[in-house]
Amino acid sequence: MATTLHSFIDIFDTTFGEGPEAVQLKTIIIPIIQRDYAQGRKGSDVTRVRGRFLESLYKAVTEKPITLDFGCGDIDVEGNMTPLDGQQRLTTLFLLHWYAAKKSNISEENYEFLKKFSYETRYSARYFCIDLVDYKPKFKTAISKEIVNQAWFPLDWENDPTISSMLVMR
């Protein structure tokens, strides 16, 4: 089995395999069998781990790249990847890229790859990711409060553990 390094951005343009079995990755779909996104949970242990992980990601962006070892999953013939391991890291990278794109106010074509990341754990998480990519925050208040106050955000989404964890990561 060959191992190659990819950024979260370029993985969507990568072809895996060779010959007639080669397939270009089009989407990453967190499957229904995966647990909820947990890196945004509250609690001292999770907060400590999250802080260390975010610090590592910050250093990777500002200093030296790091390897996150998350490339384990199946890719079907249509190019849809269902990760078997690394869902937490992939979701954090999705959120990091979303935040950086929106904060930097880059053009939509430069962050369209985020639309290729999806959740199947429950419909609310799937639609939250879709709506989040389209949302243009103002950054005048806490981003999580700003998101929750949007017309596209149903109040019952606050009860979805994946969404509430994503909001903590902001």
Annotate the PLM regions.
Residues M1-R170:
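Glycine- and hydrophobic-rich flexible loops that cap the catalytic core of alpha/beta enzyme folds
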